Amino acid sequence: MPILEVNNLRKIYTTRLGANRVEALKNVSFSVEEGEYVAVMGESGSGKTTLLNILAALDKPTSGEVKLGARNIAEVKEADITRFRRENLGFVFQDFNLLDTFNIRDNIFLPLVLSGKGFAEMQRRLVPIAKKLNITDILNKYPYEVSGGQMQRAAVARAVITNPQLILADEPTGALDSKAADNLLELFSALNNEGQTILMVTHSVKAASHAKRVLFIKDGAVFHQIYRANMSGEQLYQKISDTLTLLIAGGEENA
């Protein structure tokens, strides 16, 4: 059953005086099944960021619809959208988005605090997550006292502690060194193997090769997609690289 459905999504940006129109997304349609791990790739300016912002309910499409768990996001009232986002989506960003004035524990607790959860409930959820992510000994430290890899694991903990239907990750390995990036990608795979649905936007072929499906966006439209099926990580890496070469060279859409 699809946990996310994107139907004929269009986004047009118009300049202030209406002289120029830029179509950032052109009738984009796809779905993400519960438990899938999907990577979205494309060149800068292809529409990936616009798509992610709409999926995150941070922007609205010009036309088309996005359904999360069968609910049309556009029908969520403006007053309820923040709560809807907090209860259904988990976010992992390139720059971590941790608050320097909060220790790691309080950063992770933040979405639960905003949802009105009590300390006992928050602690009950945190203990197994912190153990799994290997961050138990840094919970009392502040973001500026830990490494980039530790900050990103804390951000992942914050994303999963609400039990979201879907994790949206935006270039999650972009600010990490190769070892920390590898650790994060292994963590994402482990979370996915436990049933967590993940959609990740990335420029990294290595990151995308950990996913079970890769969507390619070009000029605001879905250009191609690859399913991992029985491919090894190395085989998927090569197929992604070949597709990106075709995309950059201007190959046929849906080739």
Task: Label the model's feature ranges.
Residues 56:
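Helix-to-loop junction immediately C-terminal to a conserved catalytic motif
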Residues 41-43:
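The feature captures the beta-strand-to-loop junction immediately N-terminal to the Walker
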Residues 142-146, 150-152:
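Conserved ABC ATPase signature
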Residues 161-165:
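A short, proline-enriched helix->beta-strand linker immediately N-terminal to the Walker B motif
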Residues 64-72:
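Conserved ABC transporter NBD signature motif
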Residues 167-170:
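Catalytic Walker B motif of ABC-type/P-loop ATPase nucleotide-binding domains
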Residues 102-110:
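Short coil-to-helix segment of the ABC ATPase nucleotide-binding domain corresponding to the Q-loop/switch region
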